[in-house]
């Protein structure tokens, strides 16, 4: 059974109980599909205060994470995960994480994630040890722990056996370059709003067509940039044209 090992270098290992103890990722850990280990740079300091940061050269606000504690933690993580493990630094300067990137990461046997804090980490550590830098969006967080958890969750969903239904990951938003279609469950009528009749018809071909059209329409309205990088089939073009026409006529 294929599995993924993820080691995280973080000042707050307790945060990752959200991954190991809850939801799909917890189930993956229990099934042996995901192995998660955290390494705290404070454990690799030698001074009384367990100092992991210092003032930046050149002045300026904030503090910068020191190289040595990070480097020593990385040595231990690589000893456990293997030298071939890909080292990833989560930072606003990285490439934006997309579903296609997640698919590539899910093919890995081992990942080592670096969760920075303060103003960031010493650039010399990045140059010497980091294979890839990834960002989860154009905004700033207090540290790399949440982005690391986002990456772990997204990758875990693609591990064979991690989801309850084999098709669930394939039907997620972005998997085929489109946003997801609307979903409904019981009751059929709520506050005078009805579930679309096509979903109650039992006609699987019509349902598939409706769902594809809704995905295309949502993507057109909310994330048109995704359509620019996707080649639409003849059926998809027709469905999108129908969607736009019906929307404009309503």
Curated annotation (Swiss-Prot):
What EC number(s) is this enzyme filed under? 2.1.1.228
Which InterPro entries is this protein grouped with?
Alpha/beta_knot_MTases, tRNA_m1G_MeTrfase_C_sf, tRNA_m1G_MeTrfase_TrmD, tRNA_m1G_MTases_N, tRNA_MeTrfase_TRMD/TRM10
Annotated GO molecular function terms are: tRNA (guanine(37)-N1)-methyltransferase activity
Q: Which SUPFAM superfamilies match?
A: alpha/beta knot
Q: Which reaction does it catalyse?
A: guanosine(37) in tRNA + S-adenosyl-L-methionine = N(1)-methylguanosine(37) in tRNA + S-adenosyl-L-homocysteine + H(+)
- Compartment(s) where it occurs, according to its Swiss-Prot or TrEMBL record: Cytoplasm
| Major place of residence | cytoplasm
**A Gene Ontology BP annotation from the UniProt entry:** tRNA N1-guanine methylation
Q: Which domain of life is it from?
A: Bacteria
What family name appears in the similarity comment? Belongs to the RNA methyltransferase TrmD family.
Give the protein's biological function.
Answer: Specifically methylates guanosine-37 in various tRNAs.
* Quaternary context: Homodimer.
PANTHER family referenced in this protein's UniProt entry, alphabetically? TRNA (GUANINE-N(1)-)-METHYLTRANSFERASE
From the Swiss-Prot or TrEMBL record, give the protein name. Answer: tRNA (guanine-N(1)-)-methyltransferase
This protein's species is: Pseudomonas fluorescens (strain Pf0-1)
State the gene name recorded for this protein. trmD
